[in-house]
């Protein structure tokens, strides 16, 4: 990678529970990624966003989310495991990425967290 090349990674926190393990795992991941040269990181936390239910209109938060993802080289989605599936929070984030999705054509990494 040349000096001018830079990867831009968007990391999405997929849990809104206070003190959640998913957020802790994301923090560890981001700390490690920031040690690497040529990588910029943007963390998206849905807890501070005004994301709408699908079909009920768009919000400024959704537009900002779409801009960040469209401008990124890649995306990492994190989620706790809830009853064998992903969280409602990460689903809502994905639903607010527009149609066609801002994720289209992007490399996506998944960070799953399960306790117990």
Task: Describe the predicted segments one by one.
Residues 101-106:
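Short, structured loop/turn "capping" segments at alpha-beta junctions
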Residues 1-99:
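N-terminal beta1-alpha1-beta2 submodule of the flavodoxin-like/Rossmannoid cofactor-binding fold
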Residues 107-116:
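Short, glycine-/small-residue-rich phosphate/pyrophosphate-handling segment
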């Amino acid at each position: 990678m040349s000096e001018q090349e830079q990867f831009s990674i968007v990391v999405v926190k997929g849990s809104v529970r206070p003190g959640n393990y998913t957020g802790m795992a994301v923090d560890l991941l981001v700390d490690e990624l920031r040690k690497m040269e040529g990588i910029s990181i943007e963390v998206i936390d849905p807890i501070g966003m005004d994301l709408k239910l699908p079909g009920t209109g768009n919000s400024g938060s959704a537009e900002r989310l779409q801009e960040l993802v469209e401008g990124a080289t890649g995306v990492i989605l994190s989620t706790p495991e809830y009853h064998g599936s992903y969280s409602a929070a990460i689903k809502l984030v994905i639903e607010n990425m527009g149609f066609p999705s801002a994720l289209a054509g992007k490399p996506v990494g998944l960070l799953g967290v399960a306790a117990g």
